[in-house]
UniProtKB/Swiss-Prot annotation:
It is found in: Cytoplasm. It comes from Mus musculus (Mouse). CDD domains: Peptidase_M17 (cd00433). Homohexamer. The lineage of its organism: Eukaryota, Metazoa, Chordata, Craniata, Vertebrata. GO terms for biological process: proteolysis. The modification Phosphoserine is found at S54, S180, S194, S238. PANTHER family: CYTOSOL AMINOPEPTIDASE, LEUCINE AMINOPEPTIDASE-RELATED. The gene is Lap3. This is Cytosol aminopeptidase. Cytosolic metallopeptidase that catalyzes the removal of unsubstituted N-terminal hydrophobic amino acids from various peptides. The presence of Zn(2+) ions is essential for the peptidase activity, and the association with other cofactors can modulate the substrate spectificity of the enzyme. For instance, in the presence of Mn(2+), it displays a specific Cys-Gly hydrolyzing activity of Cys-Gly-S-conjugates. Involved in the metabolism of glutathione and in the degradation of glutathione S-conjugates, which may play a role in the control of the cell redox status.
Amino acid sequence: MYLLPLPAAARVALRRLGVRGLWDRGLSTADMTKGLVLGIYAKDKDDDLPQFTSAGESFNKLVSGKLREMLNISGPPLKAGKTRTFYGLHQDFPSVVVVGLGKRSAGVDDQENWHEGKENIRAAVAAGCRQVQDLELPSVEVDPCGDAQAAAEGAVLGLYEYDDLKQKKKVAVSAKLHGSGDLEAWEKGVLFASGQNLARHLMESPANEMTPTRFAEIIEKNLKSASSKTKVHIRPKSWIEEQEMGSFLSVAKGSEEPPVFLEIHYMGSPNATEAPLVFVGKGITFDSGGISIKASANMDLMRADMGGAATICSAIVSAAKLNLPINIIGLAPLCENMPSGKANKPGDVVRARNGKTIQVDNTDAEGRLILADALCYAHTFNPKVIINAATLTGAMDVALGSGATGVFTNSSWLWNKLFEASVETGDRVWRMPLFEHYTRQVIDCQLADVNNLGKYRSAGACTAAAFLREFVTHTKWAHLDIAGVMTNKDEIPYLRKGMSGRPTRTLIEFLLRFSKDSS
C-alpha cells in the first residue's frame, strides 16, 4: 500500500468546505489505492436538483451528505461526460470522481440511431476512470449507473491504451463493479469491451511486429483460451496455391513476408452439422499501395489495414467466450501489399478462385482482390450468412467519416439485424446503395471480366462493393466498409486517440441476437 499525497490546493478547498480529510485525521489504515466513480443525472426541470444514481445516493448518505454539499458549492451542475473529483470523504475511497450522465430519461434517439443513455454512461464512466488513472491509483470501483454493461464498456474501453513498446507506461487500473449490482451485465460489458480492445491491439501494433504469421498466432492463442469448441487452421502459401486463389496471391507476391490464410472455427451449436455463419475480414497487415504507391504522409496508419480481419476475429473470440449456441467460421486472407519486382503492375490480369479474371488497374485497390478469393471460399461452407469487413476505400471515409460503418447488403433482413445491434452498442452502421448502376462500372472492362477500379472517380465505396458482389452468390451477404471508423481522434469520447477496433462490439451483439433468434 502507498499513500497518495492530496494536492495542497485540494486540502485548502476541503478545509474551506468544512470537510476534515483522512489526511487531517491521520488515518493510516485508509486504503489509498482505490478510487470510486459515481454518477449524477442532469436536472429534468429547471427547478429540480440533479439526482445521484442509487449508488451515488447511498454513498452520499454514508458520508452524511458531504458529497452533495461539496458538489453544490464546487461549481455548476455537471454536464454529460464531465467530471469533478473530491478527496478525503471516506477512508475506503481517498478519491471520488462524480461524473455527469445527462438526463435520466435519455433513451433511443431515432435521429442519432443509438441509445443516448447508454452512450452517456460509456462516455462518463470512461472519463471518470481516466481521472483515477491520472491519480495513479491502481484500482477503481464503478457505479453501474443504471446499466452495468454500458458502465463496464466505458471503463474497459476508456482505460485502454497501446503502450506495449514504451518503457514508461500508464498505471494499469483494475475496474470493478461498485456495490451488489448486476454483476452478470458488468461481466458481459467487460467481455464486449475486451473484444474491441483485442482488435485495437492488433490494429495498433506496428507492421514489423504484426506480420501475417504473428496475427494468426495471436488469434489462435486467444481463441483456444476462449473455448474448447474451436479449431484454427493457419494455411500456408502452398495451400493458397492449391485453392487457386490467384487474386490473393497476386497481392501477396510483392512482399518478402509470406501470406497466410487464417481459418477459424467456433462450433457452439449442439448440432455439429448446423450451417455456420461465415465472417470474412480483409487482412492487409501493411498497405504501401504497391506499385501504385501511396503518399508517404500518414502511410504509417496502413499498419491497420487489417482492421477487417482484426474485428471479425475478435468478435468470434468473444462469441466463443459467451458460449453462444451457433457455429461461426472466420476467414482472413493475410499479407502485405508492397512494391517490388514481383509485385502486381497496373494493367495486369489475375484469376480468382471462381475463374473470373480481374484487370488490376490500380494496385492500391488490393483489398478487394484478396477478399474476392476469400468470399468464393466462404460459399463452400453453405453458410446461413456471409458478412465481410474491410478498411476498403478512402471514399467511405469521405462519405461517412467516423460517424458510422457503411453497410452494403443484398438482404434487408440482414441489414435490419445489423442496424438493431448497432443501436444497442452505439457503434453505428448506415446502409449504402448496391445498385446495378455501380456494377456496370466495374464489369465494363477492356481486358478481363471485371476491373478492380470503377469506370469513374466518383462513388468509390459503391463500386468497390459492386466489385465484391461479383464474387458472391449468397442471398444473405453484407459488406462492411470500415475505412472511416478505423481510427479515433476525439470523436468517440470513451476511446483514446488511435486505432478504434470498430465495429467489433456491433458484430458481437449481432451474433448474440442471432443466437437467441436461432434458439
